Amino acid sequence: MKYVLTIVALAFLVFSAQPSEAVEALHTYDSMKEDTQELASQYPEIAVYSEHGISTGLDLEIFSVDVALNITELSDEELHALPTMYVDGTHHGNEGMSAEASFLFLQDVLQRSAADPSYLEGKRLVVTPSVNPDGYVLDCRSNWNGVDLNRNYPYMWGMYGTSD
């Protein structure tokens, strides 16, 4: 529980510490993917870009960035033992600002960590800007199959309040 509170406090401090530049336009899926790859490549000691699978309809990659101190030197066991904060965007594809917020959060953490490596000490961050790339591209709430990913997890699938 103390790790959760620490991470929540850290997230609050990151976003409240200083004003950021206004978002003039939302990323497209392609520009988000390209900018996320580019951002991770600027911080090779602490960030690793990876792709995890393909979306159900448009065959788009679901990608993320894993962030930790000396990430390329950590074993899988060491990496998975770190307290981890997971941030994602666009469970609802038509809520593009959630992808922007997760990307800007990643950018801010990487910049701060480069300036002060102790910022990440003993922590891990995983950011997936879009968990619903089909919905993001189509600007619709659900995925390609009409499933609202924010409501339909395995628990009580198909029960009251879920989508088909």
Question: Where are these predicted regions, by residue range?
Answer:
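Active-site/substrate-binding loop(s) of hydrolase catalytic cores
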Residues: 78-91, 96-164
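Short, flexible coil/linker elements and helix-boundary hinge sites characteristic
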Residues: 44, 73, 116-117
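Secretory targeting signatures
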Residues: 1-22
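Residue-level detector of flexible, active-site-proximal loop/helix-junction positions
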Residues: 55, 69-71, 134, 156
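Short beta-strand-to-loop junctions in surface cap/lid or active-site-entrance loops
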Residues: 64-80, 90
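Short glycine- and acidic-rich boundary segments immediately preceding or forming the N-terminal edge
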Residues: 19-63
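Intrinsically disordered low-complexity regions specifically enriched for long asparagine
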Residues: 14-18, 39, 136
